[in-house]
Amino acid sequence: RLWKDTVNFYARGYVSNTLPSFYMRHYHSNHYYWDNENMDKEFRTRVEGELNISRWKTNLRAGVENIKNYTYFNQNAMPAQESGNIQVLSATLKQDFRLGILHLDNEVTWQKSSNETVLPLPQLSLYHNLYLLAKIAKKVLTVQLGADVRYFTKYNAPAYTPAIQQFHLQAADDQVEIGGYPIVNVYANLHLERTRKFCREDH
């Protein structure tokens, strides 16, 4: 307990040692063809801790993962493996606030890959949702009006190849960073018994 509030702490961990999927090992089509019989098993270990304070609407989670023989699609949209170890550190804070019918939900994630060339990640991701939530018309109609915003720092996001329907590393001669700008949505949500109407404008 913390100042008479209940505090929950959780610790988790897992270990996995599995072959890459059949799709990563075998694929035949007109434009792409591969048979990777000698792929090694992908070995993953992860430990994380989580702190939750319900009354404060606070949740904090942090962890570290080690990946050996990470399997991915390379710059040529072909399956590949990184024989070394890759570490990924991450921490996420969720904090919600409420004042009457006014709500503000927040989520902040920090993450770091030890090999940005093979496993690029945005270092910081933010999500905020500000809205009014109330019941009207004799409390049978629930109305939610609000706006949310998403943001992540610039990074070399994966490219996409429709022929194999997969994301892969960007080509070396055509590197483009995305991110570094907010994505804002304004929305309205109405709920009356079994009827729900939702509209949203994206930017």
What are these regions (language model features)?
Residues 1-203:
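Exposed, low-structure sequence patches enriched in small/polar residues
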